[in-house]
UniProtKB/Swiss-Prot annotation:
Involved in intramitochondrial sorting of proteins. ATP binds at residues 124-131. It comes from Caenorhabditis elegans. The lineage of its organism: Eukaryota, Metazoa, Ecdysozoa, Nematoda, Chromadorea. This is Mitochondrial sorting homolog. One of its GO terms (cellular component) is mitochondrial outer membrane. One of its GO terms (biological process) is extraction of mislocalized protein from mitochondrial outer membrane. Disulfide bonds: none annotated. Residues 1-6 are mitochondrial intermembrane. The gene is mspn-1. It holds the Pfam family AAA. Residues 26-342 are cytoplasmic.
Length: 342
């Protein structure tokens, strides 16, 4: 009996020691891993995104791939319809011909000449719809869309940035067809200099090497960049971005079309002449015009509330509302230019 009790006691102590060791190791891993909290948050976000996008959650991802997968665009931001983009008919037609059609032909044709370009550059002044166009392309082509935040590729631990750069392409490959979108690409892949930090230079080199590798394969992966400073982009990157599209400041006709898109769900008086407003808004971009419309509606709402009315009882917008908003916005822009010159 004594021997039996001793054996039971030993067994209990062994089990207790094993349990304590397991919990200790678990907590040590938790507190010693510098990326533990980031990885846990990434797992939760990826699970939610995959549910929204209908992606198979059984696909295995490494911890670096999970961090990249958090940058899939899902929900309401998954893409834009072509009719949400005003004033870009010629550009939209060219994007359809050079990108959308080749993506559809890729699985049907054996010719590499019918494959889509592996690198696309959208360049032009700020606020002209480059990001919106990129999302519209992804939606029309049925592609997954990774809105790559370059800050997420940087890590203070040696070698981690290169692993994250590799994860960008491995994630894109697992969920292809995929568009990897890099906004302000000039800030990430700008001209390399001898004084660049070693880790940054290595990450750029890794990114370009992987890009070349996928370009020579049959994978449907497209890197799309947007910039308002194309001359600052590294020449080696420009060589890889064979399809380049200028997104210019809209002219008067295009501004009128953009205003129609922005105001299509708003109450406007029949006497409003959007053509005249577009003429008065010379030099304004699409995002500028959206702000002008917001100012016009805000002024109307303020006047309605001041007179004792409700925001839900707004009268249709008048020509004068838009004229005042354009004048106010243009005046602020002019003052900003003067301060910059001073």
């Amino acid at each position: 009996m004594t021997d039996r009790n001793e054996l039971i006691g030993v067994a209990i102590r062994v089990v207790a020691a094993a349990a304590v060791s397991f919990l200790s190791v678990r907590y040590l891993v938790k507190y010693l891993d510098p990326n533990y909290s980031v990885n846990e948050e990434s797992k939760k976000k990826v699970a939610q995104l995959f549910h929204e996008l209908g992606i198979d959650r059984q696909i295995e991802l490494s911890e670096h791939e999970i961090r990249i997968a958090t940058q899939f665009v899902g929900g309401e931001d998954v893409g834009a319809d072509w009719d949400e983009i005003g004033g870009c008919e010629e550009l939209v037609a060219e994007l359809k011909d050079r990108i959308i059609l080749p993506l559809r032909f890729a699985s049907q044709s054996g010719s590499h000449l019918l494959s889509p370009p592996r690198g696309i550059l959208l360049y032009g002044p700020p606020g002209c719809g480059k990001t919106l166009l990129a999302k519209a392309v992804a939606r029309a082509a049925g592609c997954r869309f990774i809105n790559l935040q370059v800050s997420n590729l940087t890590d203070k631990w040696y070698g981690e940035s290169q692993k994250l750069a590799a994860a960008v392409f491995s994630v894109a490959q697992k969920f292809q067809p995929t568009i990897i979108f890099i906004d302000e690409i000039d800030s990430f892949l700008r001209d390399r200099q001898s004084h660049d930090h070693e880790s940054t230079a290595m990450m750029k080199a890794q990114f370009m090497t992987l890009w070349d590798g996928f370009s020579s394969s049959g994978d449907q992966i497209i890197v799309m960049g947007a910039t308002n400073r194309p001359r600052d982009v590294d020449a080696a990157i420009l060589r890889r971005m064979t399809a380049r599209f200028q997104v210019p400041v809209p002219n008067a006709k295009q501004r009128s079309q953009i205003l129609n898109v922005i105001l299509r769900n708003e109450k406007i008086n029949n006497t409003v002449n959007l053509g005249e407003i577009a003429q008065a808004a010379e030099g304004l971009s699409g995002s500028d015009l959206k702000e002008v419309c917001r100012l016009a509606l805000l002024a109307r709402a303020k006047a309605t509330v001041a007179s004792g009315g409700s925001v839900n009882q707004l009268l249709p917008l008048e020509q004068s509302d838009f004229e005042s908003a354009v004048h106010k916005y243009m005046r602020a822009a002019h003052l900003l230019v003067e301060e910059t010159l001073d």
